[in-house]
């Protein structure tokens, strides 16, 4: 299967972010926050944003110039 270069290079970033989404949704559920109506979409959007932001902070991508030099 031919995946795009970006996905082959950054698969661990996406996997980590999706794992964080599940964890944050579990934390929100354990805290007892009960969302109704449009709030469910807002909570989902916020968990996605926070998860990808944290994944970007934790996982740093190497510079492409460094990769090409090796």
Swiss-Prot record:
Keywords: Cell membrane, Membrane, Transmembrane, Transmembrane helix. It is found in: Cell membrane. The keyword Transmembrane helix applies. It holds the Pfam family DUF2754. GO terms for cellular component: plasma membrane. InterPro entries: Uncharacterised_YaiZ. It is a multi-pass membrane protein. The chain crosses the membrane at residues 13-33, 39-59. Coiled coil: none annotated. This is Uncharacterized protein YaiZ. The lineage of its organism: Bacteria, Pseudomonadati, Pseudomonadota, Gammaproteobacteria, Enterobacterales. The gene is yaiZ.
């Amino acid at each position: 299967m031919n995946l795009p270069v970006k996905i082959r290079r950054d698969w661990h970033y996406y996997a980590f972010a999706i794992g964080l989404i599940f964890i944050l949704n579990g934390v929100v559920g354990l805290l007892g926050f009960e969302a109704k109506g449009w709030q469910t979409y807002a909570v989902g959007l916020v968990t996605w944003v926070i998860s990808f932001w944290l994944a970007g902070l934790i996982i740093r991508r190497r510079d492409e110039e460094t990769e090409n030099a090796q």
